[in-house]
Amino acid sequence: MNNFEVIIGIEIHLELNTKTKFFSPSPIDFEAEANTLVHPIDLGYPGTLPRVNKQAIINGIKLAKALNMTIDSEIHFDRKNYFYPDLPKGFQITQQFRPIGKNGSLVLYIDDESVKIDIERIHLEEDTARQYIKENEIWYDFNRAGIPLIEIVTRPTIKSSKQASSYIDEIRKIALLLEISDARMDRGSLRADINVSLRPYGSDKLGTKVEIKNLNSLNNVKKAIDLEIKDQFQKLINNQEIIQVTKRFNEKDQVLETMRKKESTINYMYFPEPNIPIIKLEQDFIDKVQINELPNEKKLRYQKANINKIYINLLINDPKLSKYFDKINYDDKEKISNIFFSEIVALANKQNRHATDLNIKASDIEDLLKELEQGNISGKHLKKLIPLLVDNQKEIKELLEENKMILISDQSYLRAKILEIIEANSKIVEEYNQRAEKVTKFILGSLMSQTNGQANPVVSSKLVKEILEEKFK
């Protein structure tokens, strides 16, 4: 392998989460029964005219900004002409000549090293119908036909399966944080076509590429690329020809299977879409499209706050969770992250719910932490109180009083109680000079027992120490 350089290019198809399709008013719902969300425009019925979904354009601008791209000042659509059963119109509306974004880049951090991925273009287009097998027959679900998607095309500069899977994962995270797609590979809302080739080191000429499709997980992306690299390497060292083909990854057998041979470049006879006029994008409109904090920015902010690495990954992979976490206004982010995950997220997991579905208000968590900080409740109380915050409409003070969880911090009261315990247990207390820790624990245990665990442990420990040291000095 040392004699050959791996060259990988990736095309990602990212379905956008708009409420309706790109060019028709048909709603989008992944869970809907097959062929129930189909409009005459989706099927190309005569006399139908497309109407552009504005939100799809906005989502395209968001992604272009996130990928540091040059955004075109005009939106042009083109027809890609070909026949296939999943394309009833006989053409796909896409952006061949004037993509919405060009010349971008994305920096990855892999094993503490930065890797820059060059992105050639992103363009908007409509999705095709979904093909599936049912009762040994091929069926088509046209619910997917017309869903807006963005195709993201890298330059052939990716060097390994690890870089490739990291890049796809970063695009997935960006899409989630921008809230433009659910980016689920298992559902097909994020699909990646991988082009792999090898060439001798020092050569400027690209080798014959092999395309890999049907990859439904990041793990399969790595496996498929590594298999293809190994196959091409063996052919090259044995002076065998590499044929340009399209392959798919057979997950069951963990092998690559050839789908079809690419004998020549297909002529799609692109031409401008006659039914959609050119859309001018004013700079003011582009400037008003704001993007959320990106994954690397969010990661850096959490790292600076000393949040656990595992928690950081969970937050970055779940924008809904990170948005909820960030609403909690508390300076010690490390402390709140430990409580947030060990108590709130753990409680949600037990109930098979998302943490946000518990309806625990961020302000209630803040108030609870203030009570803990001020010594009004203990850590044990906090653990007991978290479940009570689910759907809570009461003030925290009211909740504490109802459940008798406010700690006793009155020093006069606690001192009197401690003196009573010492007087009633003089024999044990007399052992203080020989067994200070044992005597102290005994008195504190008795105090907690007499106050039903309400004595403030910090204040109580301090008072017991002061009283005993004064008595035996």
Swiss-Prot record:
Family matches, as PROSITE patterns: GATB
Alphabetically ordered keywords of this record: ATP-binding, Ligase, Nucleotide-binding, Protein biosynthesis
InterPro entries from the UniProt entry: Asn/Gln-tRNA_amidoTrfase_suB/E, Asn/Gln-tRNA_Trfase_suB/E_cat, Asn/Gln_amidotransferase, Asn/Gln_tRNA_amidoTrase-B-like, GatB, GatB_Yqey_C_2, Gln-tRNA_amidoTrfase_suB_CS, Gln_synth/guanido_kin_cat_dom
Catalysed transformations (reactions): L-glutamyl-tRNA(Gln) + L-glutamine + ATP + H2O = L-glutaminyl-tRNA(Gln) + L-glutamate + ADP + phosphate + H(+); L-aspartyl-tRNA(Asn) + L-glutamine + ATP + H2O = L-asparaginyl-tRNA(Asn) + L-glutamate + ADP + phosphate + 2 H(+)
UniProt xrefs under Pfam families: GatB_N, GatB_Yqey
A single MF term (Gene Ontology): ATP binding
GO biological process, one term: translation
Enzyme nomenclature, EC number: 6.3.5.-
Top enzyme class: ligase
HAMAP family: GatB
Function (record text): Allows the formation of correctly charged Asn-tRNA(Asn) or Gln-tRNA(Gln) through the transamidation of misacylated Asp-tRNA(Asn) or Glu-tRNA(Gln) in organisms which lack either or both of asparaginyl-tRNA or glutaminyl-tRNA synthetases. The reaction takes place in the presence of glutamine and ATP through an activated phospho-Asp-tRNA(Asn) or phospho-Glu-tRNA(Gln).
Quaternary data: Heterotrimer of A, B and C subunits.
Family, as annotated: Belongs to the GatB/GatE family. GatB subfamily.
Listed name of the protein: Aspartyl/glutamyl-tRNA(Asn/Gln) amidotransferase subunit B
Source organism of this protein record: Mycoplasmopsis pulmonis (strain UAB CTIP)
Gene: gatB
